[in-house]
Amino acid sequence: PDIPQIVSGLYNGMTTGAPLTIEFANRDTHSQDYANVMRHYRPSHADMVAYHKFNGFNDPRGGGHFSARLTVALTAAGVVAKKILPPGVTFDTRVAEIGGCTDPEGFDEVLRAAAAEQDSVGGIIECRVQGVPLGLGQPFFDSAESMIAHLLFSVPAVKGVEFGSGFA
């Protein structure tokens, strides 16, 4: 399990204003699995782009900072953010689809089949937020939707974001 260790920015249960540093030690590493990544880039991964962007000086073990391990840090940041939200802001989330399957009873089978094929599947996660203060964000580039989309696209697996009625 990923156990957080708070390194800085917290004192007596309160944030101090200093940078909040949370460390998650990864005890499940398999660096040898990435030995061929520099010669055979993985489809839909950042391996090739990282190699060229950093002139071959990137560390391919585990995908580096392009890894899905980034998700644990984003989740930790989300936990902290939820604690500082104003009262009345609520979230309702659900997994709406996995690999084309919309029946929650079938999700496990879709995931097992993908794992057996050593493949991955896409999905749709729905999040509804209520009680958001009026006037949140700024015009144009810093609108609430722009900032939320920017953050969501920081998650490596995210390929699309919908607001309101979505793409319909």
PLM regions and their residue ranges:
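Generic N-terminal targeting/processing segments that precede catalytic cores or assembly contacts
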Residues: 1-168
